[in-house]
Amino acid sequence: MFKAMLSSIVMRTMQKKINAQTITEKDVELVLKEIRIALLDADVNLLVVKNFIKAIRDKTVGQTIEPGQDLQKSLLKTIKTELINILSQPNQELNEKRPLKIMMVGLQGSGKTTTCGKLAYWLEKKYKQKTMLVGLDIYRPAAIEQLETLSQQTNSVFFAQGTQPVAKTTKAALSAFKTAKCQTIICDTAGRLQTNETLMDELVSVKNELNPDEIIMVVDGLSGQEIINVAQTFHKRLKLTGFIISKLDSDARAGAALSLASLLQVPIKLIGVSEKLDGLEQFHPERIANRILGLGDVMSLVEKAEQVFDKKDLTKTISKMFLGKMDLEDLLIYMQQMHKMGSVSSLIKMLPANFSVSEENAELIENKIELWKVLINSMTREERRHPKLINRDPNRKQRIIKGSGRKMDELNKLMKEWNKMQLKATEMGKLLKTGSNPFGGFGQFF
């Protein structure tokens, strides 16, 4: 999210201990300067940066310290607290009132229509409740068609009335909503390239007709500082209740988008973390603060795993692995489940900075996993369950190569690395029994 992790700046520029009784301006001057540069480089709003730096300075300079106290840890704790303060606002979670009426607004290209579908999917998964999706973008027929497709994919009710005035369509949608056995209605309003009075008047007419519980602006995570003025215009006319930041799975610096909560005092409710329908997550200020600091987001990673893996199956697979009995069938299922959690790159971003892997290496890992899946899928079930059969029989290897369209050396590398993994897993199992650290060097296989 931010190119320069704030924790690495602190570690690099600030000495661990000082002998004085209080922290002085000089002790923190360099680190605050570099943090300021990092935040501005990430497109965080200047006013937000100034307030952030001032808050850290006020809380650290003059602070009484114990002899030998670790200043780095102390400063990181203060930075994290202030980051959470910037990102946090009251009513952070989506309104739990039912029936729930949501009005979605935003600029063209922000991912608003796609986000409507993701939100319907998120509500269904989280609350097991049905949603009605209403197409009000009468200026872009493709948007209404897209919303209809999304409604089919999310098992939602779809409503639209072509090019009818949006207020009239909203009124008709509300009538249909009352009899549709849906708990939530989401109105996808027209996106524009820029704000103007005509657009705002139209949105106000929808608001007056719908009387929404939530007015959510979808903001592109790639947006620059101009999004702040746009959001202020929307908020002035509509009184926004929240933001959804889209495209946070990209290399977006996202500083401008994340500045909105502090500047407008409006909460960020959800974030888009992938292009898939399940790529919407609740916004947790503390977790985002951890990512910015380079401390990772292990809680979100655990939640993703819990959604994908069956606990009993996972326990069984891990037990087989440590006993050296995990076969290629188990590995294939495991890789398929991992794929459901997201790309290797997106998962690595949730790990602390000291576990970081470059984008290039993440891509290599992704490619290797896809290659292995192709090769393993070209094996018979008997071969997957008894990999030694492949090494013993050249004819089996030839058949797998022919079926997969891959090269012999790629299959040989898979089998060689598989054997290494089996040996390493067995060693790990033995180390676990003795209470030693079993994970040293295991990552080399990917």
Curated annotation (Swiss-Prot):
The keyword Nucleotide-binding is assigned to this record: yes
Lineage: Bacteria, Bacillati, Mycoplasmatota, Mycoplasmoidales, Mycoplasmoidaceae
Catalytic activity: GTP + H2O = GDP + phosphate + H(+)
Protein family according to the UniProt entry: Belongs to the GTP-binding SRP family. SRP54 subfamily.
Subcellular location per the Swiss-Prot or TrEMBL entry: Cytoplasm
UniProt note: domains: Composed of three domains: the N-terminal N domain, which is responsible for interactions with the ribosome, the central G domain, which binds GTP, and the C-terminal M domain, which binds the RNA and the signal sequence of the RNC.
Gene name in the database record: ffh
Domain of life (superkingdom): Bacteria
HAMAP family documented for this protein: SRP54
Keywords: Cytoplasm, GTP-binding, Hydrolase, Nucleotide-binding, Ribonucleoprotein, RNA-binding, Signal recognition particle
Protein name: Signal recognition particle protein
Keyword RNA-binding: yes
